[in-house]
Amino acid sequence: MRPFRAIVFFFAAIVCLAFPAPADDFKPNGLVILMTDYGTDSIYMGIIRGAIYSKFPDAKVNDLTNAVPPFDITAGAYLLVEAAGEYPRGTVFINIVDPGVGTPRKSIVLETNNGYCFVGPDNGLTTLVADKFGIKQIRELTNKELWRAETTSTVFHGRDIYGPVGASLASGVPVEKCGPALDSIVKLDLKRSVVENGVASGTVMRTDPYGNVITNITSTDLKSLDIALANAIEVTIGSEKWIAPFKRTYAEVPEGERLVVVQSSGFVECAINKGSLAEAIKQGFGAAVTVRKAK
């Protein structure tokens, strides 16, 4: 019997390789997560929450952030990919950074291979989450039965379309009910980090409230440069250049000193212990960054 079992296992392995496991189905957990450029004290947030609860009173609504820089789709894409993976499968993300609201740009739901749904304008906001989690299907939001029942505004699709559709998905409405399938999404032409000739090049993704500068250069890029803890790193951001040590924590350098760390999502962060590097160098989102091992 042993040879027979071996043959069975062999062919089972071949089948698994030829037919990989399917992507996870979207199974809603009731969570609806909001990311917008509406601002932290805007009445728009209360209104969109009302639209969600009107459609699905049992929804669990939370904010990823409402402080995306106004109209900044690229910043929104970076923030979304940095945080989304911390949420459980079955989460609905409503993402609204929409300077083209009311124009012919499409409204979509993107279902990813790991069981998330992202609802919002098709303007590039989902570029990085699509790359990271994979696309299972894309639907255009044309089914008006899922929209707000009252007249639809041309300037508040968050209330009239995205909130109600996101709530519907969280309540168990199938993704396929949202509208017709699309073949692709609009993607931003984003600069990825690159390692060449002993230099990692990238861009500033964001600065945080402490003035730390987070880049899109990764810990893997540092390993490619053979940079280890305690090594000195030559950093250039925009027109500013300096050398700082690579540390695990901020407190490993004296107060007011610069350092480089790998932040919680695996990106290279440049900082000042108990100070604001962003204020010191006057560089922010989109600034060019290079790092190399200091000689």
Regions picked out by a protein language model, each given a short descriptive name:
Residues 7-18:
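Bacterial N-terminal signal peptides
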Residues 285-294:
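Surface-exposed interaction regions enriched in Ser/Thr/Asp/Glu
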Residues 29-31, 43, 55-61, 67, ...:
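Active-site histidine-anchored catalytic micro-motif
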Residues 30-33, 59-62, 91-94, 107-109, ...:
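Structural motif
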Residues 1-6:
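Positively charged n-region of N-terminal signal peptides that target proteins for export
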Residues 19-23:
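Sec/Tat signal peptide C-region and signal peptidase I cleavage site
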Residues 216-281:
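A conserved acidic, glycine/proline-rich C-terminal tail/linker
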Residues 151-217, 221, 226-227:
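Anionic-ligand-binding alpha/beta catalytic cores of soluble enzymes and soluble regulatory domains
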